[in-house]
Amino acid sequence: MPQILPTDNPILDAAKRELAERAQKTAPLRTANDAYNGPARIISINTSAHKGTRKSPVADGHDTVIEQFGLASDAHAGHWHRQVSFLAAESIQTAQARGLDVNEGDFGENFTTQGINLLSFPLGTQLKIGNDVLVEISQIGKVCHTRCAIYYLAGDCIFPHEGIFGVVLQGGEVHAGDDIKVVKLGDGTCSFTPAEALQEVEQARREGTL
């Protein structure tokens, strides 16, 4: 919180402190680039039976990823451009440092990653997970039109500006602890993503709401 210089008016000082504390609590949670250290890997695989809710880590630490569909046991899987989702553990740690009681899956991500800033890669970048699974980045960030259960349960949601989505080019088994490798750097486009979806996200970024 920024330093609040005292004045001769204690009521004004208290009001300034309250406003500063409120601004700190409501400012967008963002993770510094230097927070990503160590090998790039999946540390948790998370699924849910319904959309708009927290996801839970799979009990045995592995699941099946289906080509052009997503995680077999997840509600967000389907024939669309947001088949799987990623969020960095470093982002969750940033939220924890702000006082939020959150852990892997609480922001609705399928894959909690560590050691790699996926936000730094353009659309179309292809990621190899473990031995088999190949995912192409299809959307970076999202626009939330309404606050879902995740926001109210966690107290905030960082996924709109720190999460990414992908489409499954090749399925297979995925395990917590699997390495993540960048096998192809994208050119900023993804043929699977509707133009209006990207336009909505870009407009939100320009307006400063994302």
PLM region descriptions:
Residues 106-116, 156-169:
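Short, structured beta-strand/loop micro-motifs enriched in basic residues and often containing a Trp
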Residues 148-149, 178, 192-194:
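Short, charged, solvent-exposed linker or helix-capping segments at domain edges/interfaces
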Residues 166, 173-176:
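Conserved ATP-binding/catalytic segment of the ANL
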Residues 2-134, 139-141, 173, 188-210:
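Electropositive, beta-rich accessory/interaction domains or terminal extensions
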Residues 42-44, 168, 178:
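Short, well-ordered strand-loop elements centered on a beta-strand within folded domains, enriched
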Residues 131, 178, 183-184:
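Conserved "cap/hinge" positions at secondary-structure junctions
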Residues 145:
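A short alpha->loop->secondary-structure connector
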